[in-house]
Every structure is written in C-alpha cells, then in structure tokens.
C-alpha cells in the first residue's frame, strides 16, 4: 500500500506506507535544498537508505545530474526508482539515475567502482565518486558511524564532498574522526549534520581533485 508525498515544487510522488520507512519531512528537505543551493547544479548525489527517494527527487529538481540510491527493502526500492524516473522525465534526458536494492554496509564495502553500478559501464572514464551523500537510516539503527568510515576508506567521495546525515535530535550519532562538522541544524525531533572530509587525515590520493 502506498500514500502520496508532495515535493517542494508541488509534484506528488509515491510514499511507502510501512513502519520501516520514515520519509524526510518537507521542512527538512526544503532546509537541505536551501543550504546546498547552487552547489547541486551538475553534481552527483549518493542517497543511502533512500526510502521513497524524496530527498533525491528534490536534488534532481535542483540540478543534480547523477543519482545512485541504495535501499534495502525491495518494494521500497521499486517505489524509489519509479519516483526518480517520474521526476527525471519532467526535466532532462541527460540525467543518470540508478536504484540498487542492497544492504547499506555490504554495498559500501564494494566501493564506487563495483560491477553492480551500471554507471561504471555506461560512462567509462568518468569519476565514479560523489559530490553529495545523504545518509538517512532508521534513527535507532546504529548505521551512522561505519558508513562514515566506509565512504572515506572505500573512496566514495572527493575532497570537496559533503555528507548530510539526518538523525534524531534526542540521540546524536558520533562523528567519525575522518569528518568535520561544518553545520548543524535542528528541526523539532530531527537534526541535520553537514560533514566535510577531515583533510588532515590521509584518506585521499594526491591526485584527488578538490572539484
């Protein structure tokens, strides 16, 4: 069974009606979009624990050109893909969208060049790393710190990347020492952490660009 969820633009997308899925609220999505602004144009976006894909849909409407969404529940992943495709059809045919049904940790361990990512086959020579990562696991899942480490050690990100964590204001996750807190916002029971790589730690090759 599915409900409806309205994007900032007014477009409605499908939303799974189950206890395991907690859609990011309109207020929080709008805050993220306002903070990131024009940085989203032409950017790449990795959506972790994607759910309905609402946040990725918002990013798509603001200029993101490549999205990879990871969702562990098969039916929810199907809904996510449908939503992203529906939104992309109203924008531009040059957008690359991919939704993969997989468990978060096991997938991140494979790194961005793994064979399951179709983009790597379709776009040889392009940088597989991501400009933005949105991490929104169930608040009580404990799935915050290990993904932070894997994003760095498995080279999912660039020196200039931003990781946005949505979490509970009542139970803030620990920030891995490979990241630095750039910005923190509170919206009722929800908090947003905007993290950037700690460049003092040697997670990046010398050849890695800041762009």
Segment roles from a protein language model:
Residues 1-211:
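Class I S-adenosyl-L-methionine-dependent methyltransferase catalytic core
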């Amino acid at each position: 069974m599915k409900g409806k969820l309205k994007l900032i633009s007014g477009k409605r997308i499908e939303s799974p009606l189950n206890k395991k899925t907690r859609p990011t609220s309109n207020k929080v999505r709008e805050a993220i979009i306002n903070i990131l602004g024009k940085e989203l144009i032409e950017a790449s976006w990795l959506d972790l624990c994607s759910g309905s894909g609402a946040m990725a849909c918002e990013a798509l409407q603001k200029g993101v050109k490549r999205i990879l969404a990871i969702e562990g529940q098969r039916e929810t992943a199907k809904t996510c893909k449908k939503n992203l495709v529906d939104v992309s059809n109203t924008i531009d045919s040059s957008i690359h969208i991919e939704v993969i049904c997989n468990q978060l940790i096991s997938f991140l361990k494979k790194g961005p060049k793994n064979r399951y990512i179709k983009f790597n086959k379709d776009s040889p020579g392009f940088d597989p790393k991501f400009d933005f990562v949105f991490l929104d696991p169930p608040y009580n899942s404990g799935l915050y710190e290990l993904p932070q480490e894997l994003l760095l050690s498995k080279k999912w990100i660039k020196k200039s990347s931003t990781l946005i964590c949505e979490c509970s204001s009542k139970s803030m996750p620990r920030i891995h020492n490979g990241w630095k807190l750039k910005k923190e916002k509170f919206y009722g029971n929800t908090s947003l952490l905007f993290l950037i790589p700690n460049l003092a730690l040697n997670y990046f090759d010398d050849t890695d660009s800041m762009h």
